[in-house]
Amino acid sequence: MRDRVRWRVLSLPPLAQWREVMAALEVGPEAALAYWHRGFRRKEDLDPPLALLPLKGLREAAALLEEALRQGKRIRVHGDYDADGLTGTAILVRGLAALGADVHPFIPHRLEEGYGVLMERVPEHLEASDLFLTVDCGITNHAELRELLENGVEVIVTDHHTPGKTPPPGLVVHPALTPDLKEKPTGAGVAFLLLWALHERLGLPPPLEYADLAAVGTIADVAPLWGWNRALVKEGLARIPASSWVGLRLLAEAVGYTGKAVEVAFRIAPRINAASRLGEAEKALRLLLTDDAAEAQALVGELHRLNARRQTLEEAMLRKLLPQADPEAKAIVLLDPEGHPGVMGIVASRILEATLRPVFLVAQGKGTVRSLAPISAVEALRSAEDLLLRYGGHKEAAGFAMDEALFPAFKARVEAYAARFPDPVREVALLDLLPEPGLLPQVFRELALLEPYGEGNPEPLFLLFGAPEEARRLGEGRHLAFRLKGVRVLAWKQGDLALPPEVEVAGLLSENAWNGHLAYEVQAVDLRKPEALEGGIAPFAYPLPLLEALARARLGEGVYVPEDNPEGLDYAWKAGFRLLPPEEAGLWLGLPPRPVLGRRVEVALGREARARLSAPPVLHTPEARLKALVHRRLLFAYERRHPGLFSEALLAYWEVNRVQEPAGSP
């Protein structure tokens, strides 16, 4: 599997843009590099406005809800059972009730009924509602919704799961059906927008008090945290400690919430989901809907208990299935007739993480998929839809139901689908080399402005390398700690790892407060022996001395020169080099090569230049730090023979130094 894990160093920005970000955001070059790669160019980009999105059908749905309010119609809110669906359901049930609606929730039983609107439940829905409103589901329930409409029940579908070729009957509000919409709200996000549109129609202020519920759903569903989602999550995270909803407030207090998205992802959302996974989603929904503090406190305790049981079931299922997973198979398709359907999604994720293969699990007639590019989970299911009772989901995750007697045919079908694609690869994207220890406090503070971290806005990873020192085990041998170049590295759940003489670490910069002192450490995300490192702006650079490279070029070896290197192109044309595209060239000229014997060549070849680049830099100004960062990357790429990085770093070096060649150089 390690051959499908690729480390890549992110490219350096054009110098003018890099400096503009440094100036606009008042940060050093290290943080500016991270901001630039996320599209943050100005302070306003870090705080996008939270506005009403122009979703297709949104205003029509709000008008239908207003009519239902005025006529006293019974509204049934049919939500999904996961954290996104439950928070979205709570938003609309609470929000509509506050406006005087006759509204009640309905959540299907995860284990007995599964995902979506069931035909067997349609008679009950007909009896209980005049308006049927879905949250985080419904986009694939054509027959069920048509039955409701034909029997006089109005239907509004709010969803964000991958739609089919045609939308279902009824009034549909779905981000994917809005042309040119870049934003990706989740089920809870769409529910929040619908309530907002209704408030606007009624002349009321935006219902921002519901942003905390929507933020929990957005984070739980691993939505990209940029643009509108970023604005929503920032607003919601700030509101959680003093939430208007006592259940959410007490749950946050119980798990030690301090305002970070990661705490929602790994503490709050799993407890909400645990109730659903074990068939008791109504307890999580009651927690989000109750206004009674005593009831809320008891329900928080129940969610803790359910989460502990979920962890036990998960570990047992993983121990059973992981040995059956063949990491060489194009897809891992496993049946566990006695397995617990409620935890198989997490188990599938952990098997995917261990094998880097798409995983399809079936337990008691229920199924789950976890996948990674280039294989789409929902498209894989679509290739076998004639074998399924129902299905739905996204590229990365999906769910389905099936007759287990058809499992062999299903397995063959999805394996054939997966075989059409190249092997998935996990990329470890590294921002840069870890800065000098003296800069870590400032870099940490400046990077904190990137929060909330999450999908689409990952916490920056740094590269740290060298000979590990002072290695020791922690936590009864479960974890590993050691030092690299004076920086403490913590590798969680890696206690059995035998460190090589030299190691490369991809890690997160963290701040550790202890006894009144602050220390800056690296939390290892991945470790390995020194290997190839991808990155840079070209696939070829100087794997040999420049003079030798030029001599080989004169003998006819193919050369690539970037179009934005006119001096190099002119030199190559005059020298008669055979110019080729980068993927075909054996040599890549990453710097203007004239004059061959000038100071420029020293950077590539000379001992004097290497000593100059490795000398301790003077870091009094942001510009000095910018030069030091470029020098450090250049020296690293050259000495460790990473051609792509070296070619890019050479261009950056010339740009930040603007070296003047000696007069009279050839």
Swiss-Prot record:
Binding site for Mn(2+) 2: D84, D136, H160, D221
Molecular-function annotations in GO: DNA binding; exonuclease activity; metal ion binding
Pfam family, one: DHH
UniProt keyword terms in alphabetical order: DNA-binding, Exonuclease, Hydrolase, Manganese, Metal-binding, Nuclease
Binding locations of Mn(2+) 1: D80, D82, D136
EC number of this enzyme: 3.1.-.-
Domain of life from the UniProt record: Bacteria
The keyword DNA-binding is annotated on this UniProt entry: yes
Cofactor: how bound: Requires a divalent cation; Mg(2+) > Mn(2+) > Co(2+). Structures with 1 Mg(2+), or 1 or 2 Mn(2+) were determined; the authors conclude 2 metal ions are required for activity.
SUPFAM superfamilies, A to Z: DHH phosphoesterases (SSF64182)
CC cofactor: Mg(2+); Mn(2+); Co(2+)
Subunit-level organization: Monomer. Intact protein binds ss- but not dsDNA.
Similarity field: Belongs to the RecJ family.
Cited function: Single-stranded-DNA-specific exonuclease acting in a 5' to 3' direction; has no detectable activity on ssRNA.
The name this protein goes by in its record: Single-stranded-DNA-specific exonuclease RecJ
Species for this entry: Thermus thermophilus (strain ATCC 27634 / DSM 579 / HB8)
